[in-house]
UniProtKB/Swiss-Prot annotation:
Protein name as annotated: Uroporphyrinogen decarboxylase
Metabolic or biological pathway, per its Swiss-Prot or TrEMBL entry: Porphyrin-containing compound metabolism; protoporphyrin-IX biosynthesis; coproporphyrinogen-III from 5-aminolevulinate: step 4/4
Alphabetical list of Gene3D superfamilies matching this protein: 3.20.20.210
Species this chain originates from: Jannaschia sp. (strain CCS1)
InterPro entries: UROD/MetE-like_sf (IPR038071), Uroporphyrinogen_deCO2ase_HemE (IPR006361), Uroporphyrinogen_deCOase (IPR000257)
One of the record's GO cellular component terms: cytosol
Entry's localization field: Cytoplasm
GO biological process, one term: protoporphyrinogen IX biosynthetic process from glutamate
Family per similarity comment: Belongs to the uroporphyrinogen decarboxylase family.
Database matches in HAMAP family: URO_D (MF_00218)
Function per UniProt: Catalyzes the decarboxylation of four acetate groups of uroporphyrinogen-III to yield coproporphyrinogen-III.
Length: 343
């Protein structure tokens, strides 16, 4: 396995004293070069849909930090836009979408096969990255999981408790299930095209999985992930897949096996020693440093990074954060992190 890229070795089940490292949102506003390129693009969505500039911001943290993986620069809400939803971003507030709250909203949506015209620039970005990344760097594609994407499509924005989505799920299950099926089908096609374009790994982000409890979690977080992963694996048998059902709590146990994922990403609420005992037995674990420490820096950052590394080095581990790096993080703290992990 020594000839494989380091991240792929972890995904294949190899334990290492020094794990591969990448960070969620590693291409982002904490980097001055990102801010300059985003200004050049004009706005966030224009950056996402410009293959040359999107590839540039994806490559920036690789040049600066030599991470073991590079994740495509895009957004989980490009699928709703490709399906026919209006999408725009409000400065300082985040995304806004036209809402789907009933059957008439669903009737306006395109089919899963109609998304590629909108999303072709994303596939072009992947093709550029597959050519330009260093040979030792793994290219990760991604999409939002159906439940998380649905919460935005129903509410028209991010919501702290996902109440509008829960209301539709309980009050009009027929419309809700149709929406979930459509997003699931579109996600399969989107990720399939990313892999065809050159993505070596894909990750499924279910940022709001933790708001689903009991049977609802199994139906709307676990089952769609299983369907997506099963279909992708049928088309690409050797494709490694990372699943991130954020804040799943005890539902993390057995999740990777249940959905067929090669790696389970965990949030900051999970203790690394507990993860080693309860999750790493199923395969690779990714995580899970608190992003706040990327702002704090210093020995607090270095010692916690070493603690997580050492707790999980008995099995396959990809070092990452428990959530995305924040705009107020100091880029110099990334060097502190990498020195701590790699020393």
């Amino acid at each position: 396995m020594a000839d494989k890229k380091k991240l792929l070795r972890s995904l294949a089940g190899e334990a290492m004293d020094v794990p591969p490292v990448w960070l969620m949102r590693q291409a982002g506003r904490y980097l001055p070069e990102y801010r300059a390129t985003r200004a050049q693009a004009g706005d966030f969505l224009s950056l996402c849909y410009n293959p040359e500039l999107a590839a540039e911001v994806t490559l920036q943290p690789i040049r600066r930090f030599d991470f073991d993986a590079s994740i495509l620069f895009a957004d989980i809400l490009l699928i709703p836009q490709a399906l026919g939803a209006n999408l725009w971003f409000v400065t300082g507030e985040g995304p806004r979408l036209s809402t789907i709250t009933d059957a008439s909203g669903m009737a306006r949506m395109k089919t899963a096969d109609d998304i590629h015209e909108t999303l072709n620039p994303i596939y072009e970005t992947v093709k550029i990255l597959a050519q330009e990344l260093p040979k030792e760097t793994t290219l990760i594609g991604f999409a939002g999981a159906p439940w998380t994407v649905a919460t935005y499509m129903i509410a028209g924005r991010g919501t702290p408790d996902q109440a509008p989505a829960h209301k539709l799920r309980e009050g009009d299950p027929e419309t809700f299930d149709k929406l979930m099926d459509l997003i699931t089908a579109a996600t399969i096609e989107y990720l399939d095209m990313q892999v065809q374009a050159g993505a070596e790994v894909v990750k499924l982000f279910d940022s709001w999985a933790g708001s689903l409890k009991g049977e609802a979690f199994d139906k709307y977080a676990l089952a769609p992930a299983k369907r997506i992963i099963s279909e992708l694996k049928s088309r690409h048998p050797d494709l490694p897949i990372i699943a991130f059902p954020r804040e799943a709590g005890e539902k993390y146990i057995g999740f990777a096996n249940a959905v067929g994922a090669d790696c389970l990403a965990i949030d900051t609420s999970v203790d690394a020693i507990w993860a080693a005992e309860n999750l790493q037995t199923d395969g690779c674990v990714q995580g899970n440093l608190d992003p706040k420490l990327m702002v704090t820096g210093g020995e607090a950052l270095a010692s916690e990074a070493r603690r997580i590394r050492d707790a999980l080095k008995g099995g396959p581990h990809i070092f990452n954060l428990g959530h995305g790096i924040t705009p107020d993080a100091d880029p110099e703290n990334v060097h502190i992190l990498l020195d701590a992990i790699r020393s």
